[in-house]
Amino acid sequence: MLIIYRLLINLIFIISPIIIIFRLIKKKESFLRFKEKYCFFSKKKIGKVIWFHGASVGEIKSVIPLIEKITKDKKITQILITSNTLSSSKIIKSIKSKKIVHQFFPIDTNYLTNRFIKYWKPTAAFFIDSEIWPNMFFNLNKAKIPIILINARITKKTFRKWRKLNEFAKTLFGYIDLCLSSNKETINYLKKLGSKKLDTSEI
């Protein structure tokens, strides 16, 4: 199943310049920053990097208090925040800390996710809500970087879709080192999908 996914995501990668052009016209992408999705990076500081990823505004807002606390930790040199939308990048600018750096999440190809991980070398990767990316998870696991799913949310509809993928879903969710969710239904779904370490907490 991972092979099929990689074929599909590579096809998306091939046509992605066309998609980007349309998004630029609609002002949903930054002309100066869209290349980050192809792994053109911001400057990295030497030291410990913690990484947070959220799809858009809501997900990022939900972890701002946590991120602000982490900025006070002297052991952490840089906090990388990735997202998928232009609007979320504006929210991140409101966090007043020199430790914060924002990047757009790379297209989930095997090559780009590998390149991303090798460049940033995060100590831990925090994914917010229901952000599950097969190639990124596979390569984080291969690099032995802990994956933590925070404020996890899996709906009944999403659960049914993942269950159809059976072994692929179990492998993918098995890569997650810790799932945090205050939603009992989500915890139950995650358990059935293959997640092993679960905590009924919400950040």
Features from the language model and the residues they span:
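Membrane-interacting alpha-helical segments
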Residues: 1-8, 12-22
